[in-house]
């Protein structure tokens, strides 16, 4: 697996950030060497670093065995902030998707996964 981070000036590709982990994660912020300098803390990035840390911690602590119930709980906020914006600020999650590559299944939540259940999406054929 690889992480790809890019902007209008360059593209960086790196295998997993640590060879001992079996996941990649990304949010609206750069983490790869050579890209971090492009982060702009003057714009609203929708809590990108907090969301990244939630993802990284949850996947690190799980250490494999990633499955649909884990992904559903992760996106619903059971492991920390990810999609649970304060709606009074005008922000919310519009949709979330879980891709199960081993079983060739896609699950979609039409809205914030804390309030909307994931349903299998059969429109895409592997």
Model-derived features with residue positions:
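C-terminal, well-structured catalytic/ligand-binding subdomain of enzymes
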Residues: 1-126
């Amino acid at each position: 697996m690889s992480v790809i981070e890019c902007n209008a000036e360059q593209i960086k590709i790196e295998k997993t950030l640590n060879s001992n982990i079996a996941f990649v994660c990304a949010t609206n912020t750069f983490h790869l060497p050579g890209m971090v300098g492009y982060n702009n803390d003057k714009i609203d990035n929708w809590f990108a670093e907090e969301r990244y840390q939630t993802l990284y911690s949850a996947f690190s602590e799980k250490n494999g065995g990633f499955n649909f119930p884990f992904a559903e709980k992760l996106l619903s906020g059971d492991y920390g902030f990810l999609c649970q914006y304060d709606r009074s600020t005008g922000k919310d999650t519009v949709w979330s998707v879980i891709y199960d590559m081993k079983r060739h299944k896609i699950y979609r939540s039409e809205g914030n996964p804390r309030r909307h259940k994931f349903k299998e999406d059969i429109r895409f054929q592997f």
